[in-house]
Amino acid sequence: MKLYADEPGFRTIRALATVVVSALARVEVPSAIWRKTRAGELDDAAAITLVSAFELDFHGDPDSEPRFTVVSVTGPLLVAAASEVANHGLRACDAVQLASALAVRQLDPRCGEFACFDPDLRRAAGRAGFLLVPQTT
């Protein structure tokens, strides 16, 4: 959400060169945007603009590649996420996000940063050895 709304911490997130997301972001980000609309924090036009920007980042278009590298939600990833629920007491979607990050790091150890603002997910990612972005919230 920090990529699309000027919330605390947005500058740090927007400065990231590479953004890897779980395929769940396809639902989570628009959900967060529309939740802000229902709460009166955004009007419909702003929400449509933000969702469109997210869609472009997620899918790309004929003139640009997607901004995100997307991790598919597979059976083995869900098994790993279930372990993260047991290990850290995470909510289901947060466990999938952490399992996705762990899978990427296993393939490329240079992927050692984890951007997150949810305190429970941040704590779990830190315990899993990720460098947290931003360093403080």
Regions inferred by a protein language model and the residue ranges of each:
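Alpha-helix capping/helix-boundary segments
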Residues: 25, 77, 97, 120-121
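A short glycine/serine-rich beta->alpha loop
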Residues: 15-19, 84-89
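Acidic, PIN/NYN-like endoribonuclease modules and their adjacent C-terminal/linker elements
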Residues: 22, 103-137
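Alpha-helix termini
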Residues: 39-41, 60-65, 103-110
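Acidic catalytic patch
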Residues: 55-88, 95-100
